[in-house]
Amino acid sequence: MRSTPTLRRSVTTLLLVGVAFAGGCKDIPGTPGASSPSSDTGIGSSDPQTPTSAAPSDASATPGAPSASATPPASGKPATPSTSTAPPTASGGWITIDPAGQAAATKAFFARKPKPVTGNPVKVPEFNVGCKVSHHNSDDPIVLPKLVGGSHNHTFWGNKSTDANSTAESLRAAKPTTCNSPDDQSAYWVPTMYQNGKVVDPTEVTVYYGSRLKDPSKTQPFPFGLRMITGDAKNQVDTPDKQGNHFWCAGIGGEVGRSADKTFPVCAKTANIVRQITFPDCWDGKHLDSPNHKAHMANGDHTGACPKSHPVPVPSVSFVISYPLSANTDGITLASGTSFSMHADFFNAWKDEALAARVRNCLDQGVKCNSAGNF
């Protein structure tokens, strides 16, 4: 049968659709996360890495995504960081905030007087929330918004409503959360872990908010609706030069060996497998999201300060995830592949006042607070 232009166009369309759906939640290499575990806190365990103003783009990672170096659109309704909702955007697009609104929010934040430090708190700039798993689905409202079932499976905690159709405003409106602070309606997720095909849920997750910068005193809250990812879902091999993409053993006895495929540790019976993954803490001050969901964020540079391209210090979000696995770690995989494909997503929906108080009182004063934001 002779091929016709119409037939060739139809076949090409089907192939492109197939590629888009196969891409799932595949991430794009960019700003690295944590580099080493900490036995005490979730913050301060990652050495700042050299930032990049825009991570490399990959058209296969996000269907229809423009290059990370593309110029953000000048048009479109902006979002005010503290009161307005984040506007919807096509997968892979820039979301630009209102500059005047952000400037006003920043001025108001630094005008507030921090609460006097009482007692003798630990001199570490951080606060945290403790969370339990809420649900699983194959959605990703950051990378594949509105594409139900388009991703590999994820394990969610925090906001119970998170799905492909989630927006900043829908997250803030949803109640309750599986984290121990009712003021935090944010959504958090990672690829689901399996052992021989059965889901392995974390026993607990602690989300630390802190600063890895030399001077944390100028840290300010990230705006409502900011979203970001860290890690690389496409990475299936060890890359120690890029990020601390490793699981480790926490508890008495620690690591006693490696799994048969060498990708997971074997822990003593008195220890559990733990994974820490940390997000950048420098923001460009202009965008709630970027084409690759990383280019609007960066790590501090070698001086311990934010780079000129991303001059705004914001809290460094760090997940510390504990899994109920120790001696038997054979047959473990992630929904995204090997252990080295571990990545994480964060979608901010904190109540503005609650987040601002914690950042001003705890991070800016360089002291450790609990989940309620108290010393």
Stretches with model-predicted labels:
Residues 2-12:
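Bacterial N-terminal signal peptides that target proteins for export
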Residues 13-17:
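Sec-dependent N-terminal signal peptides
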Residues 21-24:
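C-terminal motif of bacterial Sec signal peptides marking the signal peptidase cleavage site
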Residues 27-113:
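N-terminal low-complexity, Pro/Thr-rich disordered segments
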Residues 86-151, 155-277, 284-375:
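Primary mode marks residue(s) on the alpha4-beta5-alpha5 output face of response regulator receiver
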